[in-house]
């Protein structure tokens, strides 16, 4: 029995060892199919990252599918039951790195697109794909650079589905219509190193950081709102000491992260943190890394179209959610586009034996096709 079109395409994509930022020919494979559908394909290479902007049509509205061909490293391949770049079907699941995150999303949209254009060659508006090989890496030469290019030439996306694995138990049970912002701090607290037996001659940075860290961890940053939970503060790394039991360290290095709602801005968080550090009279340096602002797509044309398509395919009433980590949607939403994330289940993403349920894959094709029909016919 031969593979279905979406399964065959997904196997082809998974077999390419596209560990970030490598693309390994995945985008050329997509181009070969998109050009047959009348897409103009533009490859944008920035440093070590390969990006694809493909567009069919010039009219509004512009519907875009966004995704990434890069995958995270496998870890020790001997820990995998099946080789991670040799896609293997077992008991209704396809195993391989990128099976869920997110080559399945790309494959499903391509097949849905082929079906849609065959039936609606004169569809309304325009369709585009924005594909990068930089989503799992430092994300500096991928989607953000393509969006900058589009903005410079006033090419505006109206609707965007990002194909990240949004679902939990069954495809379509959850879609992401927003994400929290992310802000990371690398804090160094300076002390005075010395012998542990002479406390009057040292200043222990571990001791001096306890007060401000306790205050930061116990603070209510906001109450959240109808779309977002309250802002969270978490210490992610703490390093101090020489390893010797008789030496007080000269510095402590602490990394912490905020996942914040639309009730706050990065500037507001930074100001409050600095005020606490100064109140405790610390000798410190701090470096901030801004990973993206929170965004929300209000219920409207896009969320309605996707939700109705999901219900029509599998009878599920989808949940709109803003939980989880950041994605490239954070670079697209600020342009004014309506953005949601829709993809397969996320239980095995980044794990050994990553997999996707083949039945979910087939349903995802139908959901994408119906969404296109609702928005562009």
Curated annotation (Swiss-Prot):
Matching InterPro entries: ArgE/DapE_CS (IPR001261), Bact_exopeptidase_dim_dom (IPR036264), DapE_proteobac (IPR005941), Peptidase_M20 (IPR002933), Peptidase_M20_dimer (IPR011650), Peptidase_M20A (IPR050072)
Residues holding Zn(2+) 2: 101, 136, 350
From the UniProt record, list the reaction(s) this protein catalyses.
N-succinyl-(2S,6S)-2,6-diaminopimelate + H2O = (2S,6S)-2,6-diaminopimelate + succinate
UniProt keyword Hydrolase present: yes
Q: Which SUPFAM superfamilies match?
A: Bacterial exopeptidase dimerisation domain, Zn-dependent exopeptidases
Question: Which family, according to UniProt?
Answer: Belongs to the peptidase M20A family. DapE subfamily.
Q: Name one Pfam family in it.
A: M20_dimer
Instruction: State the protein's name.
Output: Succinyl-diaminopimelate desuccinylase
- Sites binding Zn(2+) 1 sit at 68, 101, 164
Q: Function, please?
A: Catalyzes the hydrolysis of N-succinyl-L,L-diaminopimelic acid (SDAP), forming succinate and LL-2,6-diaminopimelate (DAP), an intermediate involved in the bacterial biosynthesis of lysine and meso-diaminopimelic acid, an essential component of bacterial cell walls.
Q: How does it assemble?
A: Homodimer.
GO biological process terms, alphabetically, are: diaminopimelate biosynthetic process; L-arginine biosynthetic process; lysine biosynthetic process via diaminopimelate
EC number annotated for this UniProt entry? 3.5.1.18
Cofactor needs: Zn(2+); Co(2+)
Taxonomic path? Bacteria, Pseudomonadati, Pseudomonadota, Gammaproteobacteria, Alteromonadales
Comment on bound cofactor: Binds 2 Zn(2+) or Co(2+) ions per subunit.
Which keywords does UniProt give here? Amino-acid biosynthesis, Cobalt, Diaminopimelate biosynthesis, Hydrolase, Lysine biosynthesis, Metal-binding, Zinc
* Gene that this polypeptide is encoded by: dapE
Q: Which organism is it from?
A: Psychromonas ingrahamii (strain DSM 17664 / CCUG 51855 / 37)
